Swiss-Prot record:
Residues 207-219, 254-276 have a biased composition (Basic residues). It comes from Gemmatimonas aurantiaca (strain DSM 14586 / JCM 11422 / NBRC 100505 / T-27). The keyword Kinase does not apply. GO terms for biological process: cytoplasmic translation. This is Large ribosomal subunit protein uL2. Coiled coil: none annotated. Residues 29-47 have a biased composition (Basic and acidic residues). HAMAP family: Ribosomal_uL2_B (MF_01320_B). Keywords: Ribonucleoprotein, Ribosomal protein, RNA-binding, rRNA-binding. The gene is rplB. Pfam families: Ribosomal_L2 (PF00181), Ribosomal_L2_C (PF03947). GO terms for molecular function: rRNA binding; structural constituent of ribosome; transferase activity. Belongs to the universal ribosomal protein uL2 family.
Length: 276
């Protein structure tokens, strides 16, 4: 896993860099674990834009990922490590002893031919999944459940992980990558280790076209819009504070303070200046 830097034979390639894909062992996905993926173009069921700056991009097929790791006690062998266009992390194809195949997020350090297992009583080893209450303090984990049996929801991007820092009663305290300290029930599953492809953040697109291939459209500043399109539009802003297209002031927290899970946040994440 490394970064391939292009020679500056053109303006676009001067700053372009991509992954060297050294860890990839197969280029075609497992046919039984692939589903069609329809593009929305950022539109909702009324055809209205509900998410800006989305559209176009290369056609993709969805790889069905096992976020639950609920096949307990059955040893699986890592058959292949593959590229997934739908996420920043790589995925690993597991072949279980009973013949079933499943995709999981590729943990850092796992190679083709390694074995993993999930369930209570599993060894604390990279790639194994177990309840958080059985994970030793100081251990890095990823693909963490927030609700028992729902499947992993936290620490799934390339290079991410959370650290087990405390245990008290039924809950385990985790330090997330955002520096947030959060309580998670001890029976929630998590996978030992970090997510692979940690060099993902070092890549540079080099040209606007690369973003378009990924389905990302341009971000237009509010100041260059018309007054009907944005509060900052039309000649000058007039000394107004930076706001969103809907008039919300920059940096205002939008999370509902009465949300039930608010009590599980021991310490909020560190916040920098929001950008518009």
């Amino acid at each position: 896993m490394g970064i391939r830097q292009f020679k500056p034979v053109s303006k676009a390639s001067r700053f372009r860099s991509v992954s060297d894909f050294a860890e990839i062992t197969r280029s075609t996905p497992e046919k039984s674990l692939v589903e069609p993926l329809k593009k929305s173009g950022g539109r909702d069921n009324h055809g209205h834009i509900s998410m800006r700056r989305i559209g176009g991009g290369h056609k993709r097929r969805y790889r069905v990922i096992d976020f639950k790791r609920d096949k307990h006690g059955v040893t699986a062998t890592v058959a292949h490590i593959e590229y997934d266009p739908n996420r920043s992390a790589r995925i690993a194809l597991l072949e279980y002893a009973d013949g079933e195949k499943r995709y999981i997020l590729h943990p850092k350090g796992i190679k083709q031919g390694d074995t993993v297992v999930s369930g209570s009583g599993s060894d604390v080893r990279t790639g194994n999944a177990m309840p958080l209450k059985e994970v030793p303090l100081g251990t890095s984990v990823h693909n963490i459940e927030l609700k028992i049996g729902k499947g992993g929801q936290m620490a799934r991007s390339a290079g991410t992980f959370a650290q087990v820092v405390a245990k008290e009663g039924d809950y385990v305290t985790l330090r997330l990558a955002s520096t947030e300290m959060r309580l998670v029930h001890g029976n929630c599953m998590a996978t030992i280790g970090e997510v692979g492809n940690s060099e993902h953040e070092l890549q540079s697109h080099g040209k606007a076209g690369k973003s378009r291939w990924l389905g990302k459209r341009p971000k237009v500043r509010g100041e260059v819009m018309n007054p009907v399109d944005h509060p900052h539009g039309g000649r000058t802003r007039g000394g107004r504070n930076v706001v969103s297209p809907w008039g919300k002031k920059e940096g205002v927290k939008t999370r509902n303070k009465k949300k039930a899970s608010q009590r599980l946040i021991v310490r909020g994440r560190k916040r920098g200046r929001a950008t518009q």
